[in-house]
């Protein structure tokens, strides 16, 4: 779709993104025309994950006062499973030892109802006690060597089988009892999807009946038996999800089971009305934008259905400290990334008692600010014109060769390059490449989307024929949907090159020659005019051009890096292109044979970042909807609301950006140019989180303003008529 038409359409029908291509299969006939679904009601969530000694040992009114103070309108409360926090009547459903004759869950539910909150009740189905083991030993998970699986954190507990009678029978009874007694809006089950392959008698029999095979002996991703088990596992979990959801709806038709962690994003989006994203914090070497990644991956299939982002106030690392507290700055940046990318925040506190209150002021400050600007957070559609494709089938079916290791880093490198380039973007599910799902985007990026079916490739051809542009890297389309190698790229007609039967690498001490042609530099070399050359990628696909191309980036082949006396190029230049650029009507195609996206993630070369950004902007071939100038690293997202549009600016500039936690925030100044939607007039400009009206200028169709000293998050809002 042309940019003019896109902006016009989003201006007129802001909710079109939520409706396009997403079947309305689940809410029809449940809500009257005058009754809004509860799913969209609540904007600020809290989770209290009780521990067994909480009843009688903590002050529930303290939490109710805190909820009121920070404008909580949705709660997630622990109810049952491993421990019941209500007077259950189900045999073997362990009641908290500290409850006595009280109903601690019922008290909180009653008081939260008085405050008009949405209520989700949490169960935990992953572990059972000794008495349950003795009564139903077949309900317990079994290891590959035939041993009942003891819990890794507490040896007097047993890990349950997720796919057997414990969940299908016992937990179904628990969920029905909870629904009958408390009538929540939904049930959320912790660790319901299991912990790898279970070898219990039920799994052996059920997998054999479904596949004719014995259970796999290893979890090797590319093993054909393991792949069949993965499909069967997904089907069993879907059956369990649908069972629980059906039983819940029988009792309260508007309630739902919330399938957090279900291993198929397409099915998750198709069959969910509401979702909790449970990536609570970061650990290891990963930027804060990893919180946004999950929301972006779900949005293609969920549309604008609500996504609640659970965040921990403590550390989430291999060695678990569940009563810990993260730094104020780390909590703020993690939450900001979620909110800026369309998630509704939900803090989780383990245990009702507080040993360290430092997190509470940070959460209160954020929630109070988000409450004040709530109407600007009720998004109806993203406005990004760039879509980055992700592929679950590539991640499941592709690999095995040395150059295919760490293949997830293609997407991570491209994602980070988009962030560094301040380019607003959404993600695109490779199973949803039809016209309806792609019409919002002028450009699709395929970061080594290697495994594509013939039909998926035809959909991409139709997208290009309609005026869409493409940037693709490395082995994109060189394998079919089952991971079987093709003789040539399925998209060779778009790329204009053919596969030359090998992948080279590692390309040690190889370089990219950056050069002008006909006395000028190509736009992909903007900011690199004085470089002459830069480092090459680590691996590259050998290709043969099938047509003429410009040659702004060519190969300087590998030469020795030791001994030092031998470190000189044997060939100063070649005519072998490392970037293939072509135009067709309104479409532009860029194919990068090297693994530049993955190499960027591994090396973090600033030149690779510039090349990727420049190539993306060249292929976009239209004025960006938002242009941001800053010396920092700022994530930019753009949204429509009913009577406004917003630009979120999340400041990731920090010495701890790549490995948290942040110690403190480092404010940056940002200049912003925003394109006004066609046929709309700007009636006001706001900086929402500092609650000010900035100076701004309108020239033609562009609003320009400066936003100084952004510590973590700012939202620029344009009121529109």
Question: What is the role of each PLM region?
Answer:
Residues 125-182, 217-230:
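Active-site-adjacent "subsite" loops/lids of carbohydrate-active enzymes
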Residues 70-102, 130-138, 203, 265-274:
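Aromatic-lined carbohydrate-binding/catalytic grooves of carbohydrate-active enzymes
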Residues 21-44:
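C-terminal segment of N-terminal export signals and the immediately downstream linker at the start
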Residues 45, 74-77, 107-150:
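Glycine-rich, aromatic-flanked loop segments that form ligand/cofactor-binding clefts
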Residues 226-721:
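Carbohydrate-binding surfaces of carbohydrate-active enzymes
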Residues 52-70, 93-115, 239, 409, ...:
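Aromatic- and glycine-enriched glycan-recognition loops and surfaces
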Residues 5-28:
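N-terminal export signals
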